[in-house]
Amino acid sequence: MSKNPLGTLVVRIWKAKNLPNKALVGKQSPYCVCRVGEVVKRTQTDKRSGQEPSWNAVLEFNIPSESYHIMKITVFHEGFRKHPHLIGDTVLSFEKAMKEELQSEWYELKNEFQFAGELSVQFKFIPTDPLYFDRASSKPVLQFPYSSVAALTPVPKKPSKPSKPRKKVPVSHPLPPTPPSREEHVSVPRESSLFTYEDDPLPSFPSPYMVDDYYTQDVFVSDNVNDYSYGVQNPTNPRLSVEDYDANHSSLPPVPPPHLILPTASSSQIFH
């Protein structure tokens, strides 16, 4: 703060109304906190006054310059163990009091952009210089003129050239191509080169009589083993004949040799 302030602002926090009740049980105990710049002061707590407290508190603030004309007032409820609960706040200007010495109004409180009651505040500014209000009233006020020199003097306009008539040129838009007809879209090329039956032993669509004739033909198997080498493998051992090779590699078990019947002696000959 400067040593020679502009003056002293006397604030009277009178009363409030329509405050929301923040007390869980019983009536609330509200108080106000005022701030101007970096200076913060508060009122006394009105015990159990509820929604319409009355403080009638007077606070003084030193105003260093005319730029300090904004005040923020916050109303709290003093809960258990003096824990503060926000009721509402407002930001107001006392610039009118710095020009006319007095200002008294009701101000609306808000809490998260919702209505939280009204607060009655009075301002009185006491300047350090006794001629402060005379100087403030004698200051020239710049008013916006109703007419200016620029508005009275017309701006010269350049002569406009005569416009040439425009020729209308016909514009031709190409038509979209005609879609193919359904017959052309579904048609199948009938070229003989696409379907050849020369390499096929049977036609693609045989008749039932042709199928019966084809599958009922007699199949003759050659007796020569060498003609069907894929059916019977050649013997790996050249000493074995084909009959021996087939006997050894047959899926059936081999036939046992016949038993030899030897002559046996009778019991009379043995114990003779």
UniProtKB/Swiss-Prot annotation:
Keywords noted in UniProt: Cell cycle, Cell division, Cytoplasm, Mitosis, Nucleus
Skewed-composition ranges (Basic residues): 158-170
Gene Ontology biological process terms in this record: actin cortical patch localization; establishment or maintenance of bipolar cell polarity; mitotic actomyosin contractile ring assembly; mitotic actomyosin contractile ring contraction; mitotic cytokinesis
Gene Ontology MF terms in the entry: cytoskeletal protein-membrane anchor activity; phospholipid binding
Claim: Cell cycle is one of the keywords in the record: yes
GO cellular component terms, semicolon-separated: cell cortex of cell tip; cell division site; cell tip; mitotic actomyosin contractile ring; mitotic actomyosin contractile ring, intermediate layer; nucleus
UniProt-listed Pfam families: C2
Top-level taxon of origin: Eukaryota
Xref: PROSITE patterns: C2
Cell division keyword on record: yes
Name listed for the protein in its UniProt record: Ingression protein fic1
Organism: Schizosaccharomyces pombe (strain 972 / ATCC 24843)
Lineage: Eukaryota, Fungi, Dikarya, Ascomycota, Taphrinomycotina
